[in-house]
Amino acid sequence: MAAQRPLTIALVAGETSGDILGAGLIRALKARVPNARFVGVAGPRMQAEGCEAWYEMEELAVMGIVEVLGRLRRLLHIRADLTRRFTELKPDVFVGIDAPDFNITLEGNLKKQGIKTIHYVSPSVWAWRQKRVFKIGRSTHMVLAFLPFEKAFYDKFNVPCRFIGHTMADAMPLDPDKNAARDVLGIPHDAHCLALLPGSRGAEVEMLSADFLKTAQLLRQRYPDLEVVVPLVNAKRREQFEKIKAEVAPDLAAHLLDGMAREAMIASDAALLASGTAALECMLAKCPMVVGYRMKPFTFWLAKRLVKTEYVSLPNLLAGRELVKELLQEECEPQKLAEALLPLLANGKTSHAMHDTFRELHQQIRCNADEQAADAVLELAQ
């Protein structure tokens, strides 16, 4: 009698964040189905968990229109080859992890061949290009969403979606140790501390750094003991920031950090940051914040017409109200930013109320996402 084929899960991850999610999912699945087989496009973490890599993740990790166009032929070849090989393999479930421009079409190809498909991490369809939801619905059997308002959006369009909570909320403690973080960064326990996070992209650092630095200078006048910490994502962004600081605020003492954004947030009394995932991480660090964002006028004009949400920051979208002050475009200027940050640095009622709400929101999205994702995969595999 032929041996029964082990549970076979195909996965495609296109960048580091997807590799981390994929590794967590594989770990959770192996705990329940030890002989399961995992194949696809994987990074080093997924491979370390036992995923057989038909292609290296770096093949898909291209950013920007110019880079994508330069690699388009190769990307299309990989997608066609994966469609053929997965169709021959007939995995029990295919999981496309993020990388929506690559994965959603691949999921559609496989669904037509009778393969069950999951898209793990919802694209921001609730915010812009909402019509993508119809293609997602045609291409997948299930979307796994990090945030409850994402599931509510898919429900409106009758697209099967499961809210699994956020892996970052699982990884971060409900009550972070501020003094321990300060010890790591060399910041006195009794000092006021402000984190500046001017973004991870070059354009963001260019547009925001000067205003953020001038804001810190204004706040230092009110709080002479103010410690300023600036985590920067890589050496390139650090060099860019240092150049701007030398022009705008050469005398402002600041701790420039290589990475360590999470430690900086936990250590700080308040943060001034660009929108994006950093705002969610800051909420989970229980650090009161102000979001400041500026873009080129035409880009902003276009964004206002395309973006369908009332708020830009994830804490506000989760809360359904303006929990965090958002100062955009001409509002994003030092005087207004400083005025918004002052009550947070005072560590009074405003920051305590924000902290308590952050903790409630953290609990809402702390659902053991790896296990929930594994549940969804196994249910679909039956």
Swiss-Prot record:
**MF terms in GO:** lipid-A-disaccharide synthase activity; phospholipid binding
The entry's cellular-component GO terms read: membrane
Which key words tag this protein in UniProt? Glycosyltransferase, Lipid A biosynthesis, Lipid biosynthesis, Lipid metabolism, Transferase
Membrane-crossing residues? none
**Broadest EC class?**
transferase
Pathway(s) of this molecule: Glycolipid biosynthesis; lipid IV(A) biosynthesis; lipid IV(A) from (3R)-3-hydroxytetradecanoyl-[acyl-carrier-protein] and UDP-N-acetyl-alpha-D-glucosamine: step 5/6
Assigned protein family: Belongs to the LpxB family.
The protein's job, in short, is: Condensation of UDP-2,3-diacylglucosamine and 2,3-diacylglucosamine-1-phosphate to form lipid A disaccharide, a precursor of lipid A, a phosphorylated glycolipid that anchors the lipopolysaccharide to the outer membrane of the cell.
Name of the protein in question: Lipid-A-disaccharide synthase
Q: Which organism is it from?
A: Salmonella agona (strain SL483)
* Gene name for this UniProt entry: lpxB
